[in-house]
Amino acid sequence: MSKKTFQPSNVKRKRTHGFLERMSTRAGREIVRRRRARGRKRLSV
């Protein structure tokens, strides 16, 4: 039986999907902008 593919790590999670990571690229800022416009409670992880 193979292992589960999801091995949670809060460090990896923040580093790849965190707010600062989003703001560091133009595409990331676009994501945050869209989520704001849509009224999301959480903009990023």
Curated annotation (Swiss-Prot):
Protein name stated in the entry: Large ribosomal subunit protein bL34
Biased composition (Polar residues): 1-10
Transmembrane segments: none
Region (Disordered): 1-45
GO cellular component terms given for this protein: ribonucleoprotein complex; ribosome
Annotated GO MF terms: structural constituent of ribosome
Superkingdom as given in the UniProt entry: Bacteria
Signal peptide annotation: none
Gene3D superfamilies reported for this sequence: 1.10.287.3980
Protein's gene: rpmH
Single biological process term from Gene Ontology: translation
Entries under Pfam families matching the protein: Ribosomal_L34
Cross-referenced InterPro entries: Ribosomal_bL34
Family statement: Belongs to the bacterial ribosomal protein bL34 family.
Keywords: Ribonucleoprotein, Ribosomal protein
UniProt feature, compositional bias: Basic residues: 32-45
Compositional bias per record (Basic and acidic residues), positions renumbered to this chain: 18-31
